[in-house]
């Protein structure tokens, strides 16, 4: 997986490449968490384009399980990009995104600069 580490605010953020499939399973989440640790990054930013569609179907429980893994390991997960089409289809996903963005562990942002702003104000 191609990625780089940026310093956003006082946080190291592992920013995944915007091509290929980066996050499609719980095993992928563990790999990303390990990569974050090896780069001493407190956050992982994953482009929406590299995520499997099943993550946005809450009935699969995949997004919830992945979010729980990141939370358990103390690594923040930022989902970066436009998810409006998914939000239009699911009230439950809209609620999940809203509640996630109120917290400090899982964030949905339109672009990396929005993540930088959230991290600068303490998410």
Regions inferred by a protein language model and the residue ranges of each:
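Amphipathic, Lys/Arg-enriched alpha-helical "gate/interface" segment within cytosolic domains
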Residues: 2-123
